[in-house]
Curated annotation (Swiss-Prot):
Protein name: Glutamine--fructose-6-phosphate aminotransferase [isomerizing]
Gene Ontology CC terms: cytosol
Quaternary structure, from the entry: Homodimer.
Species lineage: Bacteria, Bacillati, Bacillota, Bacilli, Bacillales
EC number: 2.6.1.16
Classification via SUPFAM superfamilies: N-terminal nucleophile aminohydrolases (Ntn hydrolases), SIS domain
Keyword terms: Aminotransferase, Cytoplasm, Glutamine amidotransferase, Repeat, Transferase
Domain SIS span(s) in chain numbering: 284-423, 453-591
Length: 601
């Protein structure tokens, strides 16, 4: 949620900042702004709405300079409007600030220090910049004032501060909110995501919580909470900038759906040794083997992937597994086993709720593993181990290829642990994943069929239901989520057997019901559920699998191993959801009110 960019160097900053913000659009936002500094002045450009609107305003001015900060805002305090947009300035105009996060004690700070100050916005961010002015007026240097203010803040924040009287510096701090430092020859940058500033550098340094960073064009000084200078090595962000472009596709979501076969092949390659055997770091395997119970912590689509992963971990590896919604777990931790292993699943590696759980489990001394798409992310750094998805940048808000990558990696982990436990495998996983790859390609090739299904079943509806049994039920939850988040159709996923316990009361003439029928042992049962809803007027869309199909099924996916069907059937649901949204003329990649990376609790 939200995004920050900053540049200080020898070049004009305005265009670099605008391009950087465009690379952060996927994170979700409702307004955007930049502040640019030159020898004469600090000028702020900001607008409600899309960055394209901000660009019009910024491009209408010739003002530019070699220093600047930028921000995309997702409203948390105050409605989306011009006044609440970032950057914010202090009353005297000297200090300019961008901020991601939520300050929990801003009202207390406002009451204690800023009585009589006139505020323009309703935001917690303006309180921060006014506090910097307040302490500066008490005789503190800008660094001292900034450090003092940061010490008073309770909550999450990533901050970038400009001082009109010290035009050669950006002051930076973070806590529980992502922010990176990019380094170059004669310039330095800050960014919420390395993707934003790949246009100028691929070399980055991590910023840790509670650190203060003084950024100049030719040097960077990192200080810990006690004021001690910290030396930190840089790393190269191994991201191909072209991977983050739409190319020939109309939308990022469609591109990312089409990329799933390539992602499957990459995962097979990355998790295979020279002899063609599955491989994962032995320390990870040992921690899984030693665990008496696995607790999967995730949110949204990653939570749904965790539900599928539970099937692998229990059925193949023989490890009891629980899957928890991160935002609930952090406030209502269950009674834990004696030797738990916590597995955190997050595409971005920055999910705030999951990170909050990780902080607590680290305090308890429990082992942890992060499964993420982003090397060097917060969850990756703070967990004991990391397994990477190797899916490439996922830009569309609605996750597609990360979901299938998460399931594939969980299947590989489970099979290796099963082998270590001496449990006889009933599957040649590499061979079966290759079949999955071919099956996904076949479904992608059938995109026109999926578009017709979307037209036939979802063109005018306001409600839709997804049903399945056993592992199909887990996929039905993801299918419903995909549809609702991009088409705004009220969609819900249910276990087929639960229909008669309340949900069937919602079935009316023409109500679309998408039924997944890919599991042999419950095939008759789910088809019985379909008959129940048809008897009440439902319009059934049955997605089955070769070998289990019946006459009249809407679509039949290629045959794959039953436990791997989620990797295949979900692709059909992704495409159906995509076309349902497309036909409603909606913004598929950036649905309303949603953010790609939820970095506040």
């Amino acid at each position: 949620m939200c995004g920050i960019v900053g540049y200080i160097g020898y070049d004009n900053a305005k265009e670099l900042l605008l391009k950087g913000l465009e690379k952060l659009e996927y994170r979700g936002y409702d307004s955007a702004g930049i502040a640019v500094v030159n020898d004469d002045n600090t000028t702020v450009f900001k607008e409600k709405g899309r960055i394209a609107e901000l660009r019009k305003v910024a491009d209408s001015s010739d003002f530019d300079g070699p220093v600047g900060i930028g921000h995309t805002r997702w409203a948390t305090h105050g409605v989306p409007n011009h006044e609440n947009s970032h950057p914010h300035q202090s009353s005297n105009g000297r200090f300019t600030l961008v901020h991601n996060g939520v300050i929990e004690n801003y009202e207390e700070l406002k009451g204690e220090y800023l009585q009589g100050v006139s505020f323009i916005s309703e935001t917690d961010t303006e309180v921060i910049v006014q506090l910097v002015e307040y302490f500066s007026n008490q005789g503190l240097s800008t660094e001292e004032a900034f450090t003092k203010v940061v010490s008073l803040l309770h909550g999450s924040y990533a901050l970038g501060l400009l001082d009109a009287e010290d035009k050669d510096t950006i002051y930076v701090a973070k806590n529980k909110s992502p922010l990176l430092l990019g380094v170059g020859e004669g310039f330095n940058v800050i960014a919420s995501d390395a993707l934003a500033m790949l246009q100028v550098t691929s070399e980055y340094k991590e910023i840790h919580d509670h650190e203060i960073v003084i950024v100049k064009k030719d040097e960077v000084i990192i200080k810990d909470a006690d004021g001690n200078v910290v030396e930190r090595d840089s790393y190269i962000a191994e991201i191909d900038a072209s991977d983050a472009e739409k190319g020939v596709y109309a939308h990022y979501m469609l591109k990312e759906i089409h990329e799933q076969p390539a992602v499957m092949r990459r995962i097979i390659q990355e998790y295979q040794d020279a002899e063609g055997n599955l491989k994962i770091d032995q320390d990870i395997i040992n921690d899984v083997k030693e665990a008496d119970r696995i607790y999967v912590i995730a949110a949204g689509t990653s939570y749904h992937a965790g539900l599928v992963g539970k099937e692998f971990l229990e059925k193949w590896a023989g490890v009891p597994t629980e899957v928890h919604v991160a935002s609930e777990f952090v406030y209502n931790m269950p009674l834990l086993s004696e030797k738990p292993l916590f597995v955190y699943i997050s595409q971005s590696g920055e999910t705030a709720d999951s990170r909050a759980v990780l902080v607590e489990t680290n305090k308890l001394g429990h082992k942890s593993l992060t499964i993420t798409n982003v090397a060097g992310s917060t969850l990756s750094r703070e967990a004991d181990h990391t397994l990477l998805l190797h899916a490439g940048p996922e830009i569309a808000v609605a996750s597609t290829k990360a979901y299938t990558a998460q399931i594939a990696v969980l299947s590989i982990l489970s099979q290796i642990v099963a082998k270590e436990h001496g449990r006889e495998a009933d599957i040649d996983l590499l061979r079966e994943l290759a079949k999955v790859t071919t099956a996904i390609e076949a479904i992608v090739d059938d995109a026109p069929i999926m578009e017709q299904i979307a037209t036939d079943f979802l063109e005018t509806t306001r409600n839709a239901f997804f049903i399945g049994r056993t592992i199909d039920y887990n996929v039905s939850l993801e299918g419903a989520l995909k549809l609702k988040e991009i088409s705004y159709i009220q969609a819900e996923g249910f276990a087929g057997g639960e229909l008669k316990h309340g949900t069937i009361a919602l079935i009316e003439d023409g109500t679309p019901v998408v039924a997944l029928a890919t599991q042999e042992n419950v095939n008759l049962s789910i088809r019985g559920n379909v008959k129940e809803v048809v008897a009440r007027g439902a319009h059934p869309c049955i997605i089955s699998m070769e070998g289990l199909e019946k006459e009249g099924d809407t679509y039949v996916i290629p045959h794959v191993h039953e436990l791997l069907t989620p990797l295949v059937s979900v692709v059909a649901l992704q495409l159906i959801s995509y076309y349902a949204a497309l036909h409603r003329d909606l913004d598929v990649d950036k649905p309303r009110n949603l953010a790609k990376s939820v970095t506040v609790e």
